Amino acid sequence: MRVNIEEKSYDGKRKILKNIKLDIPKHQTTLIIGTSGAGKSTLIKCLIRQTKFKGTIIDEGYDHKAMLEKIAYISQHPTLNKNETVEESIYWTARLNFLRQSKANLLEKTKKCINDAGLNYVCKQPVKALSGGQMQRVAIAKELIRDKEILIADEIDTGLDCGVARSLCNMLNHIAHKEKKTVIVISHNLINIELYDNVVVLVKDSNKTGRIAYHGSPYQMKTFFQVHDYVYILMKLNSEDEGGENLADFYIDQYERSI
């Protein structure tokens, strides 16, 4: 997916995003993190065409409008029928999306998605009996069964403990690498950052506009930002150097010079 958002503003005045240029690799996981107010949610809205912007988003020759047919989106608070069992919830999603397929085929798809999402041990339980992490797995499975090529997950690890969030990351990696999906994740959680193939860091420049300060491997981030731990990256991008310069501006310039 090639993203080129020249500018996103509201009322033609306040710029929210500027110069967002990304090549998001196929069949890999890409994590998008950022400082508060840097435009992560707005970027997602651009990707799923919920807001207008100046620029283009294309994928393998498909324009943005046509590309929407290839995208599955999972929100932080997915809508689930909590009275259904896990198996029923996923099966009926398949039934609604593949009307001409036989029941046997749909049940086979359901079984595979339950397995891929790590839900075998709770498949007969009602959704309302699940934990928050398990409900997110059901939401992912319901999108996975629709067989879209691109999966976008928005803050799905919010409120989950570290172990559960890590297991979700591992599942998303399985979906990307084994099921050949392109997975994009928005998160504020830096603990599992090394599990992703690629990381994008959004920051606010001195004009309060969201820009890219980094895009690359998580293993090169510490060197790029000159920190010994990932947790210090966003703290550093919210500070100034000894001369009073906005460090976010410095790293935006460093990144844009490198591309």
Q: Which residue stretches match the model-derived regions?
A:
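Conserved ABC ATPase signature
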Residues: P126-L130
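Catalytic Walker B motif of ABC-type/P-loop ATPase nucleotide-binding domains
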Residues: L151-D154
